[in-house]
Amino acid sequence: MAETNAKRFIKCYNMIDNALRIQGDMRRSISYTEAVRRAARTNGLVKKYEDQLIDYGRLRNAIVHSSNDEFIIAEPHLEVVEDYEKIANLICTPPLAINTICNKNFKSLTAEVKLKEVMEFMFKTGISSIPIYKDDMLIGVAHANKITKILGKMIYEKKDLEKYISETNIEDVLKILMEDNYYTIAEQSITLDRVLSLFEENRKLLLIVITKTGSLLEHPIGIVSVGDIMDINKILDNYA
């Protein structure tokens, strides 16, 4: 026998209520509405659906009598139930970047490689972001836009461009970019909503390098760039 709309709705309510309390380490004495408001401060998905979640919490109280989920006194519309189920899936089992948007078509290079080789590699492969390692530790990311700005400055200052790109190690180029804060590292469990939050929190951020545990001593398993934001939003909008 198929579940009623009310049963499905109550199941979503309980799933979200439990997930928010576990994720935010909140006491059971805190109300559902307060749990939503607190979670919205740090969880991008909860923030996006904050008003709907609160409205659905109030609707739950109209569907059942008091705290007894079995005593149903009203049936919600199917469209409402399906919308609540979608939000519940996003919050309780959020899609991971590594399984969806993450770019796994990349290559890392070592610190002693000359800038000229890096640029040639970017041109041949079309890859614009290359993690750079020294002694098996990530020391930076060679990014096409950042390199272009450095070379543009050299042209403006009428410096010997050919000599610079032929003789300079990529490690020395990265030292110039150390304070730009244009990339960060994350573990493989990072969710799409967290990816969006990172880009929102740091407007200079161009890419996120993903490793198994988020350690600089691990080689990357994927990269997410700021250009993926539109696709991330589409995935979240259609996630069910």
Language-model features and meaning:
Residues 1-3, 96-97:
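Charged alpha-helical initiation segments
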Residues 40-95:
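Charge-enriched, short contiguous segments at helix-coil
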Residues 112-119, 196:
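Short amphipathic alpha-helical segments
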Residues 2-29:
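Hydrophobic alpha-helical packing segments in soluble, helical-rich domains
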Residues 22-48:
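Short, charged amphipathic alpha-helical segments flanked by flexible coils
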Residues 122-124, 130-147, 199-203, 207-229:
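A glycine-centered beta-loop-beta connector
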Residues 85-105, 143-205, 225-240:
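Tandem CBS (Bateman) regulatory domains
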Residues 58-75, 79, 123-158:
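Acidic (E/D-rich), amphipathic helical modules within compact regulatory domains
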